[in-house]
Amino acid sequence: MKNKILFILTLLMILPLSSCYNKENREEILKVYNWADYIDEDVLANFPAWYKQQTGKKIRIIYQTFDINEVMLTKIERGHEDYDVVCPSEYIIERMLRKDLLLPIDTAFGKTPNYLKNVSPYIVEQIDATSNNERIAHHYAVPYMWGTCGILYNKVHVPLKDAQTWGTLWNRKYRGKLLMKDSYRDSYGTALIWAHRKDLEAGKVTVPELMNDYSPNAVAMVEKNLKALKPNIEGWEADFGKETMTKGKAYLNMTWNGDAVWAIEEAKNVGVEL
C-alpha cells in the first residue's frame, strides 16, 4: 500500500513583534527564516545589488535557517523574532493565524501578477483548509513547493518486495538500520496510516482525515506503534539522513521526496544503490 503524506511549504509575512536595530533603519533590512539548502548562497549575495538596481533603495538580508517546524514557531512566538518572511509547512499556518502572528500579503507579485492563477487549485485548497477565524489562508501564505514523504532504501540490503508498504519500517529484519525524519507530523501520520491500512484500502477513511485525527484513541495508537518501531530506529534526523544513506550506513530512511532524489543522485557517484 503506497499511501503518501503530502506536505506544502509556504512563504508567509510575519507580524512584527519587535524592532531593535540601533541606528539601522528596519525598513532596509529583510529578515528571512527558511529551511537549510533552499536558497542558493549566490542568490542571497547578489540580491542587495539587484534590489538597489530595481528600486533605488538599499537592503540588507538577515538570513537564518531551521530544520524543524515547531522550532521555528517557538522562536517566533516566544523569542519575539520579527522575521519578514518564513517558510513553514502548511499545517503551521493554522497555528500562526490562530495566534495572530501573520500579516496579509500583497498578491500582485510585481512582474508576475498571474502567479496565483497558475497555482494548482488543489494546492490552494489544501492551504485554505488551514484558514482560521474568517482569515483565508492564501491571503497570508504563498505556495512555494510541495512534495511527499516516503521510504528511501538501500537496494543491496532491502529487496523491492520488502519496500512496498509502510510496514517496511516495522520489519525486524532492519533492526537498528532505520533513520526516521525528526518531524512529529510525518511520524504521527505514518504511524496512523499503517495502523489504519485496512480501513484505507476499504475506503472507510482518507489520509487527510487520519493526519488530522488527534483524538485520544488516535494518539494512543500512534504511541503504541512508535514504541514498537523503536528497536529498528538508528536515529532521528532532520537533515543528515540523506548523506548517511549515500554512504551506505543506514538501510532505510523515512524522508521527504526532495531529499530522496538528492540522495539517489549523489549515491550513484560513490557506487551506492538507493
Residue ranges and their predicted role:
Residues 38-41, 97-249, 263:
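Extracytoplasmic ligand-binding site segments that recognize negatively charged/polar headgroups
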Residues 83-88, 234, 251-256:
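Paired acidic/hydrophobic, glycine-rich loop segments that form the ligand-binding mouth/hinge
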Residues 16-19:
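C-terminal motif of bacterial Sec signal peptides marking the signal peptidase cleavage site
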Residues 83, 174, 250, 271-273:
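Local beta-strand N-terminus motif with an aromatic residue
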Residues 92-95, 252-272:
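A ligand-binding cleft/hinge motif common to bilobed small-molecule-binding domains
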Residues 21-99:
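Early extracytoplasmic/lumenal segment of secretory-pathway proteins
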Residues 1-4:
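Positively charged n-region of N-terminal signal peptides that target proteins for export
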Residues 6-11:
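Sec-dependent N-terminal signal peptides
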